[in-house]
Amino acid sequence: MNVADIAMDLFRGAKGETISIFAIAKVTVTGVSRGLSKLVFGVVDQANLVNLGQYVVYSVVSMIYNITLHPLASFPGPVFWGASRWPSIWRLFKGRLVHDVHALHGQYGHVVRIAPNELAFSSAQAWKDIYGHKRGNNSMEEMPKFHKFYSGISKTPSIVSEPTRDGHRFIRRILSPAFSDKNLRELEPIVQGYISQFIDQLRSHCEDSTGSKVPLDLVSWYNSATFDIVGDLTFGRPFGSLEQGEEDPFIKDINHFAAVGGAMLIFTSHFPGRGILRFLASLGKVFQNGQEKHVTKMEESLVDRMKNKSSRPDIIDGLVKEKDGFQIDYDRVLENAAAITMAGSETTASQLSGLTALLLQNPNCLERLKKEVRSAFKSDKDITSTSSLVGVWQYSANHSPRNFTYPDEFRPDRWLDDRDQKEYEHDHGDAMQPFSVGPRDCPSQK
């Protein structure tokens, strides 16, 4: 007899009716607890023994239910992962969860059960089904979010942690102008300035006083650069790491906070309770200290920005500006500013660090990249000055032999789908733009 058959026998009464699993747990727990209490009475505290017995029996019965009768029991995945969340939590704290889930997808396919009530997907269609907009007759605009996880991030929700559709739409609408093409182009010179400062600092630190080469911690330098850039774009001033020539301790603290905090959020969202929180609090000093320093730094930057606002636009301008007689409260402004800082700095630094490591490990890719970059401009003189006048002359572009075969002949067949591919293979059809391109193209061209 297999496990499923045994479980089904447990859940059937003498007359064949199905018994509630929780009723079984209650009866079994009581019997086991009493028996154990009598066995070791006077040696172990009876109340604690009863609690232990209840926990053990309830856990066993729950696992049997999860692998036999649970609505997700038929989905592929390891038995122990489906029986309890502890296997995934254990791998989470070991830092192996992402890699182990990837291995499970290789074994079981695009859909894997990784916890009693959780499925992991890896297909392209799953992106649209889970996160995409719902269309047609479906009244639900998006799939509901897991409130226990989102509510654990912060008391005041940000654009990252807002679980409701209306709340997220509200914050997104306020922040959207800051990320428009026009606004980002206006901020581009600021970013370029910090990139130049970053490169200058690398050059000045890659040699010691004797002229010998010195290894650099690029992860630290990338963090310094990205935090300074995002700090200036968000609050109107950098955090000062590039100017100091070393990574600010604050950056290290909040990076540790982010790493530990992510694991703690997942854990507490599935295992709520005061005992769990006290246990994690005893282990999470890094998380607590990092969170406090992060909040303090964000508050200092926000207060300074609100007192000394320049005429230059920044990312949180829409959050602090009163509109239609309404202004967002301070806590929500602070929470969103902190979220933007984290989202735009550490993530970019991690990507650049990984990209650098992979390029160094793959010399052929590095050589190709170097060739593309260095062949674009041989010197600074090749870059057009910002004070110069530039424009595309349509007649020249349309009649250039570099753009079209037989440019001065009437050959409308060049635009047809059934054209002679070989004859017109060198044509650059996008060189002809009678309606212009960009934000000032003809609105009625289509």
Swiss-Prot record:
Extract the ranges annotated as region (Disordered).
Answer: 403-446
Lineage in the entry?
Answer: Eukaryota, Fungi, Dikarya, Ascomycota, Pezizomycotina
Q: Report the Gene3D superfamilies cross-referenced here.
A: Cytochrome P450
Keyword match Ubl conjugation? no
UniProt protein name: Cytochrome P450 monooxygenase ATR14
Family, according to the entry, reads as follows: Belongs to the cytochrome P450 family.
Report residues binding heme: C442
Which PANTHER family does the entry mention? CYTOCHROME P450 (PTHR24305), CYTOCHROME P450 MONOOXYGENASE ASQL-RELATED (PTHR24305:SF210)
What GO terms in the biological process aspect are recorded for it? Answer: biosynthetic process
